[in-house]
Amino acid sequence: MAAATALCDAAAPRMASKKRIALISTGGTIEKTYDELQGVLDNRTSVLDVMLASLQLQGIEIVRIPLMNKDSLQMTPQDHDLIARTAGSMAEAHDGVVIVHGTDRLARSGERVCELLGSPRVPIVLTGAMRPYVMRNTDALQNLTEALLAVQVMPAGVYVAMHNQVLQFPGIVKDKDRGTFVRAGG
C-alpha cells in the first residue's frame, strides 16, 4: 500500500510556480486617455490595470512598476537611461521584464537597454501601440498580450513584440509607412 501511495504521489502533477514578470510603464500612445475638457489625447492616467484585468493571466504574477507617464517624443537621454537601468534591476529579481513604451522612441530605448545591459539574464520585451487603448480600433491589448507571451517563451535578450511579431534588438526601427517595427534595412 505504501508503494502504491508513493507511485501516486510521484505521478501527481506538481504545481508550477508562477513566473514573476515586471511590467514597467513609461506612458506613450498605448496609455493615452481622452481629456474631454482639452479635447486631446494625453498621458495622465495609466490604463494598464484595466487592460490587465481583461486578460486571463494564469501562471504569471505581474509586478507593476509605474516609472513615468510620458509621450515618448518628450523623452530625454536621461529617460532612456532610467528605463534601461530599471529594466536591468528588475531583470535581476524577475523571470522577465515587459516595458510599455511610446512607439516614437521605443527603438531608442531598446537600443539603450542593449547598450547598458549587454546580454540580460532574462527576456526584456518592449511593446506599445499605434492607437490608444481607449480607441475602438486599438492595437494596444493585442500588443500587450503578445509581449506578455513573448516574455515567457523567448530566450534571454531584448525584443519588441507588436503586430504578431517578435524582433530582437539591436537593429530595430519604426517603419512609419507600415505602422510597425522592422529590422533596419528590412
Model regions: which residues?
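Compositionally biased low-complexity segments, especially N-terminal hydrophobic helices
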Residues: 1-5
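Active-site histidine-anchored catalytic micro-motif
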Residues: 7-10, 14-186
